[in-house]
Amino acid sequence: MIWLTLVFASLLSVAGQLCQKQATCFATVNKRRKHIVLWLGLALACLGLAMVLWLLVLQNVPVGIAYPMLSLNFVWVTLAAVKLWHEPVSLRHWCGVAFIIGGIVILGSTV
């Protein structure tokens, strides 16, 4: 159950980052303020809930084991940026993502 909590904390943290990015995207002049407030409000809600879940994780898992798992955030954000905003990602970046996944597998397999 605690590992599921860690996954949700990671996904909520990613959602918060994506909401911040969306807040910076274009909105018409008459809707700009509402657009920014909406997306930044959602970002704060996601990041706040992620923090609460993270604290629950830290009560049950050594930080040296739990923290590296948050590296998945880099993977999720990269995938979302490509899908949502069609951001270009270099081969070097994809190699880095692969190394991150490999590192998580290595660190997670010691549990």
Curated annotation (Swiss-Prot):
Q: Where are the transmembrane segments?
A: 36-56, 61-81, 88-108
- In this entry, the parts of the chain located on the Periplasmic side of the membrane are 57-60, 109-111
Keywords (A to Z) from UniProt: Cell inner membrane, Cell membrane, Lipid A biosynthesis, Lipid biosynthesis, Lipid metabolism, Lipopolysaccharide biosynthesis, Membrane, Transmembrane, Transmembrane helix, Transport
**Subcellular location, in the record's words?**
Cell inner membrane
So, what pathway does this thing act in?
Answer: Bacterial outer membrane biogenesis; lipopolysaccharide biosynthesis
Q: Which GO terms describe its cellular component?
A: plasma membrane
Q: Per UniProt, what is one GO molecular function of this protein? A: carbohydrate derivative transmembrane transporter activity
Q: Which Gene3D superfamilies match?
A: 1.10.3730.20
User: How does the entry describe its membrane topology?
Assistant: Multi-pass membrane protein
**Tell me, what does this protein do in biology?**
Translocates 4-amino-4-deoxy-L-arabinose-phosphoundecaprenol (alpha-L-Ara4N-phosphoundecaprenol) from the cytoplasmic to the periplasmic side of the inner membrane.
Give the record's family classification. Answer: Belongs to the ArnE family.
- This one is known as Probable 4-amino-4-deoxy-L-arabinose-phosphoundecaprenol flippase subunit ArnE
The protein's gene is named: arnE
